[in-house]
Amino acid sequence: VAAWGLPPAARASYQLLAPTDSTDGWIRLVDFDNAGEQAPMRPGARAWDSGCYFSLMVRVKDIGAVYTDAIELGWWTETPIAPLQFGESDLRIVIFKGPDGLQVQSYERLSPPLPEAVGSFERMTRPFNVMQMVADHGTAYRFFTDVLGFASYYTGPPVTAPSPVLSPIGIPTPLTTEVGYQAGIVYPTPGEYGRLEMIQVHGLRGEDYRERCRAPHLGILAVRFPAPDIDAIEARLRDRQLPLERFTEVAWPGGEWVDLLQTRSPDGGILQFFKIRE
């Protein structure tokens, strides 16, 4: 709790959601108590509002059935299920909107088949990506690649549709021919999981919520990565005089102790790097 900058009287409980056969892509649902005002990080936010984290991203099978079940559970969606062609991938996408500002972006790839590295799954994978909506694509992309040393999976220019089309991120259909979105995808280690995506919407000006990305506010609070060399990350941040916090011997679930380094992306998203102490 102290690492979140909360008062001494604050308390927190959590539930950890994770497939039994994985060591990454876990989701921790945290409930803060006696921690001060709780308000949405991205109140009523749309894709053209920047700051904090926009959505978790999962792969699914039979997205129509998942959609039906999610609605019955009380979730809602940004749009109907939307088609998207990303390179060779023929995708169907929908963003589910749940309680406390949580958004889960679901992908079904119709073709080509998913890579074997995705692994087998019955209906839904663990999260493979976390999306940020950013004020400036170049600034965010360089932070992850040049400062943190992440590898690039994809980056490209703004994309607009040749004719009006249903947008998975909710850009109004009549504007999709003139309002573009610019994406970048990075990862600390190349693979099918552990990715971070940043999108800048060009042509629609929204709110900037970066100052609201903090506990105990509601939404996606932070993304954590294991890091074998926290000192190297700290040195990169200090060289550029960027904010950071370092915590040693933090109690971890399971009785372990970790060293923890915390920083923020240019759009306020909290990033934590941890190393389990031997």
Label every model-predicted segment.
Residues 53-55, 128, 220-221:
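Eukaryotic phosphotyrosine signaling hubs
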Residues 1-10:
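N-terminal juxtadomain amphipathic helix
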Residues 150, 183-192:
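Acidic, glycine-rich loop-and-strand cores that form catalytic or ligand-binding grooves
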Residues 45-46:
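Glycan-recognition patch characteristic of GH18 chitinases/ENGases
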